[in-house]
Amino acid sequence: MLGVESMNVDFKDFTNQLFFQTVFAQRFLIGAGAEYKHIKIKSNTAPGINPVFDDSDYASAFGYLKFDSLDDKYFPTEGYYFSGEAKAFLYSSDYTGQFSPFTLVKGEIGTAKTLFKGFTLNFQGETGMSFGENVVPTFNFVLGGYGYYATNNFRHFYGYDFMSLGGNSYIKGLISADYEFYRRHHLNLSANYANVGNNLYEEGKMLSLPQYSGYALGYGFETILGPLEIKHSWSPETNKHFTWVSVGFWF
């Protein structure tokens, strides 16, 4: 879009939240609150345009529901997971001049099942969408890369580099086979598929055949400081290969 294959981006996010949460039916975590966020996005390598893409304050109200019975965050062998959140953006200082109130809704679901000793299948699905006339591009869903803490609407996606795919709505599925061949040592094979774009639900494209796919072969080692992971991934759409190294817990 900007006539370059890649560029460096500085992303600064300062967030404060005030929220209340409780346990519902001894299984579900439910909560609601308010959020203040300041985001600044700039790039000194984007040619011919204003290097600052956003420098705004945002105020929002949100609610969420979570359920998590997985026995491990990084290498689960049994259990289920669900997370749903709705967030209404009500105010912005509007650096871009594009803001009007809008709402983001997103959800995740997953399960892990051990088929035999040391061998586990993991299934995950997630989706996100926006409602409103002018959704600020800052809050688009952005897919690509692996090994980072998935803050805001940045999501992992094997086979594509960081921030490669984006839009105001998406749906993604992941299947992974993990084999613990020695205590705390894992080999895994993963495949993910997604549709990403603008207004996918409104245009009926959400459940069409996936536009994007990627595959990854990985090794993981559980340490007291968090997992050590190496992932090599590839996408048949681009024929590009990426290797990522992740060390420690994600914060």
Label every PLM stretch briefly:
Residues 1-3, 42-49, 76-78, 92-102, ...:
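Outer-membrane beta-barrel translocator domains and adjoining extracellular loop/strand segments
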Residues 1-2, 32-38, 80-90, 107, ...:
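Transmembrane beta-barrel strands of outer-membrane/channel proteins
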Residues 1-64, 70, 146-155, 163-170, ...:
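Gram-negative/organellar outer-membrane beta-barrel architecture
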Residues 10, 55, 76, 99, ...:
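A generic structural micro-feature
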Residues 26-30, 57-59, 76-82, 117-123, ...:
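Outer-envelope beta-barrel architecture signal
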Residues 37-43, 68-72, 87-95, 112, ...:
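Sequence/structural signature of outer-membrane beta-barrel proteins
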Residues 61-66, 70-182:
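C-terminal outer-membrane beta-barrel translocator/porin domains of Gram-negative envelope proteins
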Residues 178-212:
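C-terminal hydrophobic structural anchor segments
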